Amino acid sequence: MMNLPWLTIIVLFPILAGLLIPFIPDEKGKTIRWYALGVGILDFLLITYIFGYHYNFKDPSLQLVEDYSWVPLLRFHWCLGVDGLSMPLVLLTGFVTTLAILGAWPVKRNAKLFYFLMLAMYSGQIGVFVSQDLLLFFFMWELELIPVYLLLLVWGGKKRLYAATKFILYTAIGSIFILLAGLTMAFYGDIVTFDMRALKLKEYPLNLEILLYIGFLIAYAVKLPAFPLHTWLPDTHGEAHYSTCMLLAGILLKMGGYALIRINMDMLPNAHLIFAPFLIIIGVINIIYAALTSFAQRNMKRKIAYSSVSHMGFVLIGIGSLTNLGLSGAVLQMISHGLIGASLFFLAGTTYDRTRTLILEDMGGVAKKMPKTFAMFTTCSLASLALPGMSGFVAELMVFLGFATSASYSFEFKAIITFLEGIGIILTPIYLLSMLRQAFYGSESFTLLNKRKLIDAGPREIFVITCLVLPILGIGIYPKMATQIYNSKTETVVQHLQQVQSTFEKTSTLSL
């Protein structure tokens, strides 16, 4: 069993199983959705088996490495591997995608295409996290974009064409920078290779490393998203089906944070030391700007989308903190937001299914008719505003303390950034609790009075939210259950950065 290509299996199984969907006789989509759910569950079980029996979280090096020559002329290898940075996100992908498939249960129009695209996204997202060949990484990055575009275009709202076009333009332009920077890294020096392990060992001139860093940063800032490249996200979330939103918030945004750590931070350390303060400033802008913009949103999903932009600011600050505590907090924030974001978008979608509106002014008094939905929405909103005892609180606290204790920045800079972080933390509960008040409190609006009778959440909705809330509470109460998976890897990354920083300072002293 040890010799099986486990990573290849979990990457290819969803999309290969999805290719069988057209041959399944099913006009109403009922069989297809059970089939897709079964594929999702089976792949997630395989992931948990690999994690439980073949992954050693104490080992920071790559594990379960598979390396097959795919296109020899291009030096293109099917090279996969997992470590502490990728394993938690692979688990998150399997978990959230399976729940998103269950969340998409009401979808009946073009069900075969819909569930095939969901499974294709599943493969692409896992592929991004386990790829150890830069060209394969780019291929998986692109594979994941096409299903999102089609899911938006076919099952989106009234402005779906605009949202889908904006999404594909932003992400495609970002992808060009990945390709250009990746090719430059591969062809620099005497050895031509796309193997990330070999690319990490190459020594680049500082000016070239800075250019490479900027190229990758643009691409990953689009995906994260970071200000000012974030504007595609509210439009996409506002128009996408809520199961697609679960995948976008739960997994797709994490690809940007993961790639920043894997490539920019670990493979281009000299440039990262230069750009780290810039990342922190952008992170603070993310937190405050998105929180303030969220106040002006009338659409529930757009308001939640801006909260996602705000929360991703903490990831940038953690990555820029240059401390293990800060980086560990950034990874935990990605995991935490993946769960919380998916839950909020699912609840927004189920609320829309009943009220047929996402405009907060058209809601009101919904809590009386839908107390279970209200209770779940309140719980997930409290998780999003980082209530103590929930995962978001631990993640933000780790980032906060990690940056505050960093020896790489002056006291004045840390004081200003910490103060601004505090403002963002204060703004978050204001706009989230305001959203709850508008949608659920007060008397029932005239708009809803003229609609059909509201039906509260059923067993399916309660099951999905319970599955998402349990790990949110579990991590909040006992963070070690998550941090132990990746802590050895983040320590190694930060130690490598500190060695590079020490060498750089010695070189600067000698030159003076």
Curated annotation (Swiss-Prot):
Reaction(s) the record says it catalyses: a plastoquinone + NADH + (n+1) H(+)(in) = a plastoquinol + NAD(+) + n H(+)(out); a plastoquinone + NADPH + (n+1) H(+)(in) = a plastoquinol + NADP(+) + n H(+)(out)
Chief location bin: plastid
Record's keyword terms, sorted: Chloroplast, Membrane, NAD, NADP, Plastid, Plastoquinone, Quinone, Thylakoid, Translocase, Transmembrane, Transmembrane helix
Segments crossing the lipid bilayer: 4-24, 34-54, 87-107, 111-131, 134-154, 167-187, 210-230, 241-261, 273-293, 312-332, 333-353, 373-395, 416-436, 462-482
Enzyme Commission number(s): 7.1.1.-
Organism: Chlorokybus atmophyticus
InterPro entries in UniProt: NADH_Q_OxRdtase_chain4 (IPR022997), NADH_Q_OxRdtase_chainM/4 (IPR010227), NADH_UbQ_OxRdtase (IPR003918), ND/Mrp_TM (IPR001750)
A Gene Ontology molecular function term of the record: NADH dehydrogenase (ubiquinone) activity
HAMAP family, sorted: NDH1_NuoM
Compartment(s): Plastid, Chloroplast thylakoid membrane
GO cellular component terms attached to this protein's record: chloroplast thylakoid membrane
Topology relative to the membrane: Multi-pass membrane protein
Single biological process term from Gene Ontology: ATP synthesis coupled electron transport
Protein name in UniProt: NAD(P)H-quinone oxidoreductase chain 4, chloroplastic
NCBIfam families linked: NDH_I_M, PRK02546.1, PRK12561.1
Enzyme class: translocase
Family: Belongs to the complex I subunit 4 family.
